[in-house]
Curated annotation (Swiss-Prot):
InterPro entries cross-referenced by the UniProt entry: Chaperonin_GroES, Chaperonin_GroES_sf, Chaprnonin_Cpn10_CS, GroES-like_sf
A single GO cellular-component term on record: cytoplasm
Record protein name field: 10 kDa chaperonin
Phylogenetic classification of the source organism: Eukaryota, Viridiplantae, Streptophyta, Embryophyta, Tracheophyta
Keyword Chaperone (UniProt): yes
Length: 98
């Protein structure tokens, strides 16, 4: 049975982009360089509400590649895949191809 997680409030479900352990030329990278620091947004919550009850939407959308803090988020395992839940304000930025 396939499970689908839909985040609540201003939370974002991210699948980590695994950084390679070595460069294309064969140089081994330190373990810290391969930690989760970017990910693909899989799902987003509807947003949060301000003090007047007005909806504040999440700043990213499904499919975006985002820059994440080195620590934080909540690890979630669905089936064989691992994801992380972050709050919208924890995302450091979005990454774009030139």
């Amino acid at each position: 049975m396939m499970k689908r997680l839909i985040p609540t409030f201003n939370r974002i479900l991210v699948q980590g982009v695994i950084q390679p352990a070595k460069t294309e030329s064969g140089i081994l990278l330190p373990e810290k360089a391969s930690k989760l620091n970017s990910g693909k947004v899989i799902a987003v919550g509807p947003g949060s509400r301000d003090k007047d009850g007005k909806l504040i939407p999440v700043s990213v959308k499904e499919g975006d590649t985002v820059l994440l803090p080195e620590y934080g988020g909540t690890q979630v395992k669905l089936g064989e895949k691992e994801y992380h839940l972050f709050r919208d304000e924890d995302v450091l930025g979005t990454l774009h191809e030139d």
